[in-house]
Amino acid sequence: MANTFYIVRHGQTNWNILGKTQGHGNSDLTAKGIEQAEELAKSMSENYNIDYIFSSDLGRAVQTAEILGNSLNIEVEKTEALREMGFGKWEGLLIDEIKSEYADIYTSWRNEPHLAQIPEGETLHIIKERVDKFIDELNKKFNNKHIVLVTHSVTVRVMLLSFLNSGMENIYRIKQDNTALNIV
């Protein structure tokens, strides 16, 4: 039988509140982000029998995953495969700063995200290749397991589009709040 994946976006961070682009940069969870992760952990421990937890190696995802792991009594395995998209020159910038300094590229990112090339950043297709390879590896290694994947907004949406065999141009059709849980 196939594995079941529980794909989770990390809890709220300080940069989420400020509206800064995170990418590979990091911002710690806020008190609300910790509370979100604790609520999710409680719900998951009551409703699901989880076998493994894998997390992006970026701090905000690790913080979220460790709260889940402590509640579920499962050690968290960290991996670069679940990292957020690298936003290059945009990391740490506010959306208004990006619109001002990179207007043409930002317009492309919003209208044709599958074609956009952020300066010194990754593309959606790079993220798709990375996460598809990771899911394939998990499916070869495990069978009929319940696996939590703690990751990031863009990465979650790319994964979901991939599971749905949908194009990356549809990335904005999927919304992901902090600690959103997607079961596939």
Question: What do these predicted ranges mean?
Answer:
Residues 2, 62, 132-183:
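Active-site-adjacent alpha-helix immediately C-terminal to a catalytic or transition-state-stabilizing loop
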Residues 2-12, 104-107:
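Short coil-to-beta-strand
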Residues 7-13, 150-155:
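Histidine-centered catalytic micro-motifs
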Residues 12-78:
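Active-site-proximal alpha-helix that buttresses catalytic centers in soluble enzyme cores
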Residues 28, 71-130:
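Phosphate-handling substructures
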Residues 38-45, 128, 132-140:
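Generic structural signal for well-ordered alpha-helical scaffold segments
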Residues 55-56, 129, 150-151:
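Short beta-strand scaffold positions
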